[in-house]
């Protein structure tokens, strides 16, 4: 699909028609969720954050809004929506949830479920300065260009892991965030 031809309707159709890899059973890991917010501009974008440098974990890294599940959350989708409201002031009622991707294991011991949602273009975002240093948007056609992600195989705790690395403007996108974008790009791609 040529980058200039990328449209929101194409994405929605492909997302809903292409089943993700089978969902893994939930382990005894702590649960977390992130919202993968797709902003419905004429040229759709992903909303990303750069985490505050003052945070204990993942300080200064590019991330989707999200965090750990609370006991009060009725579902993992509710976790993603609550965290997005806390971090960037997206009202849950302004999110049209399209679905979820298979959970990924984070280096901090969480099983993280990405929740894909559409956000109206006129929505105003306000970062929680305690958690978010910066907000930025990446056009979907750039985000889903599989050639922009460079694989790196590393060994952690005597197991091999593949991480993806990418740059967007001055932002370094890697780790779980890059893995989520790459996974979503593969799901909607024309590749068999």
Swiss-Prot record:
Superkingdom assignment: Bacteria
Entry's Gene Ontology molecular function annotations: coenzyme A diphosphatase activity; magnesium ion binding; manganese ion binding
Alphabetized PROSITE patterns for the sequence: NUDIX (PS51462), NUDIX_COA (PS01293)
Residue stretches making up the Nudix hydrolase domain: 29-160
Protein's GO biological process: nucleoside diphosphate metabolic process
Annotated TM spans: none
E.C. code: 3.6.1.-
Keywords: Hydrolase, Magnesium, Manganese, Metal-binding
Sequence motif: Nudix box, positions: 67-89
Necessary cofactors: Mn(2+); Mg(2+)
Residues noted as binding Mg(2+) in the record, renumbered to the chain: 83, 87
Family to which the UniProt record says this protein belongs: Belongs to the Nudix hydrolase family. PCD1 subfamily.
HAMAP family on file: Nudix_NudL
Cited function: Probably mediates the hydrolysis of some nucleoside diphosphate derivatives.
NCBIfam families per UniProt: PRK10707.1 (NF007980)
Protein name per the record: Uncharacterized Nudix hydrolase NudL
């Amino acid at each position: 699909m040529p980058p200039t031809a990328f449209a929101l309707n194409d994405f929605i159709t492909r997302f809903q028609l292409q089943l993700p890899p089978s969902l893994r059973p939930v382990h005894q890991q702590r649960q977390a969720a992130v919202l993968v917010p797709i902003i419905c501009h004429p040229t759709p974008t992903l909303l990303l954050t750069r985490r505050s440098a003052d945070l204990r974990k993942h300080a200064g890294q590019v991330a989707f809004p999200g965090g750990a599940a609370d006991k009060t959350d009725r579902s993992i989708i509710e976790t993603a929506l609550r965290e997005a409201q806390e971090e960037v002031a997206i009202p849950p009622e302004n999110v049209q949830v399209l679905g979820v991707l298979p959970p990924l294991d984070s280096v901090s011991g969480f099983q993280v479920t990405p929740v894909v949602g559409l956000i109206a273009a006129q929505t105003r975002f306000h970062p929680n300065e305690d958690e978010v240093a910066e907000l930025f948007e990446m056009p979907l056609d750039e985000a889903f260009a599989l050639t922009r992600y460079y694989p790196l195989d590393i060994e952690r705790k005597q197991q091999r892991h593949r991480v993806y690395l990418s740059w967007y403007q001055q932002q370094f996108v890697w780790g779980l965030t890059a893995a989520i974008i790459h996974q979503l790009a593969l799901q909607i791609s024309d590749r068999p």
